[in-house]
From Swiss-Prot:
It comes from Mycobacterium phage L5. This is Gene 85 protein. The gene is 85.
Length: 88
């Protein structure tokens, strides 16, 4: 993947994550709207993880804690998770 594509993926993930959180706050019991954003996030994170299931799963879970922290923080968390997995 090119650096440009990776940057766009991070931006899209952060935007969808905020949309998911906002949808949940606006209508906590409207699961179809929440699910729509959740499905998009899943596809984006799967693409970003490029076949690494552990990375995909851990980053997806981390998104719940970093919803409002922006793209730079998402990249930092992703890099830390990648490094931790590589180090075993």
């Amino acid at each position: 993947m090119t650096e440009e594509l990776v940057n766009h993926l991070f931006e899209a993930i952060v935007v969808e994550n905020v949309k998911r959180a906002n949808a949940n706050m606006a209508e906590p019991y409207n699961h179809s709207v929440y699910k729509f954003h959740e499905d998009r996030i899943d596809r984006l994170v799967t693409t970003l993880a490029d076949g690494n299931e552990a990375l995909r799963d851990q980053f997806y879970e981390a998104l719940f804690d970093i919803t409002w922290d922006g793209v730079a923080w998402a990249k930092k968390v992703f890099a830390e998770i990648s490094r931790d997995i590589a180090e075993g």
